[in-house]
């Protein structure tokens, strides 16, 4: 046990976590030269293409230290994006220490802070590492000061390395072995194993990643899931050296994988505790706090035959991604689908892409909304996550919208731009601190504005230098209204949006104009209107296609022309009564871009 070290690698996006893990695997000989690839742990195609880590991955390696002893390193590579911070906190729960990787050129960014505080709250030993010292722009001295200044941990002897070239990585390993404490636990006590992550394998059923806190687990043992009380056989277990390797026993303090032939997706929820049936532990380990989705959107299969396979796919995906929430929903325009909850827009995009790729589905997404708290006139509190569920205006006593607390770190010269952006997003400033050349800004901004396009706009207004970390703060009363879209006097539920009254007119007009471009012309006029309640705030018309019925009258009598035009008009009128308008997929996505290009 004294020779086991469990640690995670945490950092801001693109500070070199995955590259550092590659080097560590290489030095410890986890993979042969031939099998080595860049970002070996990013196993999803999607992760490779976007160059980001989405799922935390674990690896077990043997490290021969300079003091002549062999240590077993279990480490977990974690994502850096704010949408996946839940993955990070889960990975940290399985560790005794964390490597805080900071880019020596970029310096401390918002996610560095957020992840580091998460680690400190869990009482982990944080080892700072300055990465990318081979860059011409690197300034390790300044960054070490920044770490002490902003994060508040001692960085005077922070290790300097370059994960790309491999310089300094052996020092990182030595420091790990020296500074990170060995796991504590009772090897002879009753088994307690924490489920860190699980995913669905088509051949094996549910595969779980577990950290053994007390006791040990042998192949063939009967294990019990503590929350459900169900018992299973431990058929196979082992470790990742990134490859799956079978073992006969997992000892106290180790991290490994386990297959129990669980077919039911909800059989072993993440954050649960496993114990032995014959000698069960008294109480379960403290799990993880449940995360609440911040953004909701409707997902609908394009062809309704896919509904069943879509449901299965969501089930399997939610096993792998504990923060995904979904419930069935039906829409008059789009048929049957699911209302899904996500942690942010990136999360939503990734889930949609994974569904389309891994499960071969074609999906339509409706506009994302946040959760509103509504007090009705008979004093009930309801939570509304979709515009169509919002009660009628005269039944609403007050409507409260979620406010996010946003922490931003940015260079001084972009301060003006960023403040302008925050004010435009209805934000109020709560704090501002200068650290050297960096400014730490704290704003309270409505969640609806943050999830819409705040991150993109922040990046573009600060040339990519500003970084953002946000969390839900509270609900606050606000004057929000629902803007409905009517096409030929019929409401289209999938196009409704909830917005602030001040922006409603402008958003409504923008949406109507966008729809006008996207709806193909028909044989009759199509009226597109935006309305708040019964009050129409914007309208535009998609003009009809019409034949030139006068082409055959050379010269000729005006009454003859009138008769032909009148006949055409009557025909169009009849057509309009029976005709219905097919909306193209782009029309539903138009909402996402309202207010982006025009400002």
Swiss-Prot record:
The subcellular localization recorded is: Cell inner membrane
List the EC numbers from the record.
3.6.5.n1
| Catalytic class of the enzyme | hydrolase
Q: Its membrane topology, per UniProt?
A: Peripheral membrane protein
Top-rank taxon? Bacteria
InterPro entries named in the record: EF-4, EFG_III/V, EFG_V-like, EFTu-like_2, G_TR_CS, LepA_C_sf, LepA_CTD, LepA_IV
What's its job? Required for accurate and efficient protein synthesis under certain stress conditions. May act as a fidelity factor of the translation reaction, by catalyzing a one-codon backward translocation of tRNAs on improperly translocated ribosomes. Back-translocation proceeds from a post-translocation (POST) complex to a pre-translocation (PRE) complex, thus giving elongation factor G a second chance to translocate the tRNAs correctly. Binds to ribosomes in a GTP-dependent manner.
Q: Which PANTHER family match?
A: TRANSLATION FACTOR GUF1 HOMOLOG, CHLOROPLASTIC (PTHR43512:SF4), TRANSLATION FACTOR GUF1-RELATED (PTHR43512)
Query: Which named protein is this?
Result: Elongation factor 4
